[in-house]
UniProtKB/Swiss-Prot annotation:
MF annotations from Gene Ontology: metal ion binding; metallopeptidase activity
Motif (JAMM motif) on chain: 170-183
A Pfam family recorded for this sequence: RadC
One GO-annotated biological process of the protein: proteolysis
Lineage: Bacteria, Pseudomonadati, Pseudomonadota, Gammaproteobacteria, Enterobacterales
UniProt cross-references to PANTHER family, sorted A to Z: DNA REPAIR PROTEIN RADC (PTHR30471), UPF0758 PROTEIN YEES-RELATED (PTHR30471:SF3)
Protein name per its UniProtKB record: UPF0758 protein KPN78578_39390
Entry binding sites for Zn(2+): 170, 172, 183
Amino acid sequence: MDGMENLMPREKMLQYGIETLTDVELLALFLRVGTRRQDVLSYAQALLQRFGSLYALLSADKAQLIAVDGLGLAKYAQLKGIAELARRYFSSQLVEEAALVTPSMTREFLQSQLTEEEREIFMVIFLDNQNRVLKHSRLFSGTLSHVEVHPREIVREAIKVNAAAVILAHNHPSGSPEPSQADRLITERVIKCCRFMEIRVLDHLVIGRGAYVSFAERGWI
């Protein structure tokens, strides 16, 4: 692979495969052009150095992004488009492939869905008896700091798709994923409701900014 380092991202991808691109090169591939002062590779590197990672860059809000020199509305739209495309890819992959859910897959999917939400959203993943995904739904939407959850509605949706188990999740827009006492109480209520219909609650994940808490990992479920 001599000379690979001299290739532009598109040529490198076409010759050696997309997996050979660094984060900087992959970002440059999407941005396509740099600024008057920097070529696209230098600009992509500067962006990643400023934000620290692809995740932090794509999770940044509009004010944070357009404050960067050379990053106008066009590049802001490109970056948000990349993030949304990734979110929708995760969403469709989980259902279309009827994926067997693993803890890491669950976490990555839920983070892609909930991290950037500005209100609390309560999601449920419905699974069959082999832990394959039947569907996932955003069942409840709330405010910046609260979402009202109705356990019977969760059970009703589970029965509709003949689910044997569910995974619960909601986000904390404040950034901290630490569960509140109210979070623990509603989880207990959902577990009791589901148990009555012989539906297992496998986990409840609280998603924050770049962090999460799993009730199962803490031994609360």
